[in-house]
Amino acid sequence: MPWSKFTKVALGLGAAIAAVRSTMFTVDGGQRAVMFHRFEGILEEPVGEGTHRKIPWVQKPYIFDIRTKPYKINTDSGTKDLQMVNLTLRVMFRPDVVKAVVAQFNADELLTERPQVSALIRETLIKRAKEFNIVLDDVSITGLSYGKEFSLAVERKQVAQQEAERSKFVVAKADQERRAAVIRAEGESEAARVISKATAGAGMGLIKLRRVEAAREVAITLSNSPNVVYLPSGGNMLFAMNGPSKVVA
């Protein structure tokens, strides 16, 4: 029984510590935090160094490194007495401008509006560099990558969009085929109706006319092909009015 009480006390103490830790976060030296509020969006005022409180689930801090970073550049140059010298320059910079601009766009916009993001970064950096008599020729984003989970989500979204477009194409094709079948059936029905009406009006005269036209075609074929023999199935050797016939080469 004492051991059970000790376990309960330990679990309760651990839960209390976890609850307290979930309401606090720490910003180290050389860092700043941007607070995202689930209902209000990104708060304008950045959070400085130290330990701060947050509302679990409602607030989430994003911590950025603002320390000055070195960047080395190797270049060749000529001296006054025409001697070539190789120089290694160290440029100290802070990525404040890049982070400030990127924070204005969401992840999808960075992909679709990359030229606009580059232009905004370039404009801001050129304006800032002029204060120190530095001329920047160009600034552009040459690489952009996300975390594995977001990349997989983007890939799944693209696959879903492709499947949706494919489904639309299949549905449209089926609809066109259905319409074509309806039009073809309507045409055949209309043709049958016209033939039936003509036959009813002309009687056997129309049928005899068709037979005469068929016999004329056979005669033309025989005249153009002396090696072809016409073999009627019935007793009429000229027009084969009373039965089927065939042409044998």
Swiss-Prot record:
It holds the Pfam family Band_7. The keyword Ribonucleoprotein does not apply. CDD domains: SPFH_prohibitin (cd03401). Disulfide bonds: none annotated. Residues 26-249 are mitochondrial intermembrane. It is a single-pass type II membrane protein. It comes from the Eukaryota. InterPro entries: Band_7 (IPR001107), Band_7/SPFH_dom_sf (IPR036013), Prohibitin (IPR000163). Keywords: Membrane, Mitochondrion, Mitochondrion inner membrane, Signal-anchor, Transmembrane, Transmembrane helix. Its main location: mitochondrion. Residues 1-8 are mitochondrial matrix. Prohibitin probably acts as a holdase/unfoldase for the stabilization of newly synthesized mitochondrial proteins. Belongs to the prohibitin family. Component of a prohibitin multimeric complex in mitochondrial membranes. This is Prohibitin-5, mitochondrial. It comes from Arabidopsis thaliana. The lineage of its organism: Eukaryota, Viridiplantae, Streptophyta, Embryophyta, Tracheophyta. The gene is PHB5.
